[in-house]
């Protein structure tokens, strides 16, 4: 059996970072949105090999990006193991291989690893499920703070560690430019720097919520915010000039996506987004740039991680 699932990249229209709890995680107030960059995960059963104990994953390969782990530390591999453990029946299973095709910038603050985990959960559910949406979301939250959102997609408010999700009403599509850097940033490193700098927390999203309801791109751009910006700029000062170039070339607003170093720029139209993308590339400050729209997908069954093919 071969199952391919797809999951979208995410960006944060707002990321407010509160104090750290005893477990080291910070209280967050965030607004997630999927954008139509994506990864796919293909799970293939190796029917000639049955596994009675230990991981059923025997191989993991990655194309489209360098530096992604191809071992049990990969979040997709861990997603298989975590969901397999939830089976009621403990009979032997076929071994499986995983292949990840990357279209989301790696270590860029766009939840590429979390998207892979979410797509993998959908694939395993199609293989040996159904487990039910509640179980999938529970396992997703165990795997990482962004995985539940990647499973569900759309535009959502996230609180707690980002895993407590509520749908948000939006109007129309937003046009984005995604500017990727050659080297990623470690999320724990960014949060550590944030704690050192200790900037003011911004936990109020009421103005952004109202702007999203209008569908007015300029209004939405006015309320984009990320509390991790100062930390990301401290670790990667060159991001400041990337943000300046995006605004100079016509974007309404630009912010660091998540923990960075990817930056995203909100534009008035697809045409303007193309202009901003070309200006960023011509300036020679970014590794790659893409245009995208959000929220991704036009149908409800494709708004989050979803199955593409089963054969």
From Swiss-Prot:
The protein's enzyme class:
transferase
Q: Identify the pathway.
A: Isoprenoid biosynthesis; isopentenyl diphosphate biosynthesis via DXP pathway; isopentenyl diphosphate from 1-deoxy-D-xylulose 5-phosphate: step 3/6
Q: What is its EC number?
A: 2.7.1.148
Could you list this entry's UniProt keywords, alphabetically sorted.
ATP-binding, Isoprene biosynthesis, Kinase, Nucleotide-binding, Transferase
Per the record, a Pfam family? Answer: GHMP_kinases_N
**SUPFAM superfamilies xrefs:** GHMP Kinase, C-terminal domain, Ribosomal protein S5 domain 2-like
Q: Which GO terms describe its molecular function?
A: 4-(cytidine 5'-diphospho)-2-C-methyl-D-erythritol kinase activity; ATP binding
List, from the UniProt record, the residues annotated as the active site of this protein. 10, 146
Any idea what job this protein has?
Answer: Catalyzes the phosphorylation of the position 2 hydroxy group of 4-diphosphocytidyl-2C-methyl-D-erythritol.
Similarity section: Belongs to the GHMP kinase family. IspE subfamily.
The molecule here is called 4-diphosphocytidyl-2-C-methyl-D-erythritol kinase
Q: Which organism is it from?
A: Corynebacterium glutamicum (strain ATCC 13032 / DSM 20300 / JCM 1318 / BCRC 11384 / CCUG 27702 / LMG 3730 / NBRC 12168 / NCIMB 10025 / NRRL B-2784 / 534)
């Amino acid at each position: 059996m071969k199952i391919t699932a797809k999951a979208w990249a995410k960006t944060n229209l707002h990321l407010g970072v509160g104090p750290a709890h005893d477990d080291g995680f910070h209280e967050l107030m965030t607004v997630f949105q999927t954008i139509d960059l994506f990864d796919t995960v293909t799970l293939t059963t190796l029917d000639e090999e049955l596994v009675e104990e230990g991981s059923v994953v025997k191989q993991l390969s990655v194309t489209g990006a360098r530096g992604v782990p191809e071992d049990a530390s990969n979040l997709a591999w861990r997603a298989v193991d975590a969901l397999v453990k939830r089976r009621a029946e403990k009979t032997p299973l076929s071994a499986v291989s995983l292949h990840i095709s990357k279209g989301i910038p790696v270590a860029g603050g766009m939840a590429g690893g979390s998207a892979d985990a979410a797509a993998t959960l959908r694939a395993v559910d199609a293989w040996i499920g159904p487990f039910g949406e509640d179980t999938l979301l529970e396992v997703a939250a165990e795997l990482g703070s962004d995985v539940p959102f990647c499973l569900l997609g759309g535009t959502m408010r996230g609180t707690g560690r980002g895993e407590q999700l509520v749908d948000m009403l939006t109007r129309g599509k937003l046009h984005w430019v995604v500017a990727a850097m050659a080297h990623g940033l470690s999320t724990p490193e960014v949060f550590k720097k944030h704690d050192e700098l200790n900037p003011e927390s911004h936990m109020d999203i009421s103005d952004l919520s109202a702007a999203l309801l209008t569908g007015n791109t300029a209004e939405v751009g006015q309320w984009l915010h990320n509390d991790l910006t100062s930390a990301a700029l401290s670790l990667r000062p060159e991001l400041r000039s990337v943000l300046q170039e995006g605004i100079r070339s016509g974007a309404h607003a630009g912010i660091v996506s998540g923990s960075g170093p990817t930056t995203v720029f909100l534009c008035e139209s697809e045409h303007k987004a193309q202009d901003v993308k070309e200006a960023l590339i011509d300036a020679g400050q970014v590794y790659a740039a893409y245009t995208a729209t959000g929220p991704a997908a036009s149908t409800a069954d494709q708004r989050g991680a979803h199955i593409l093919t089963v054969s």
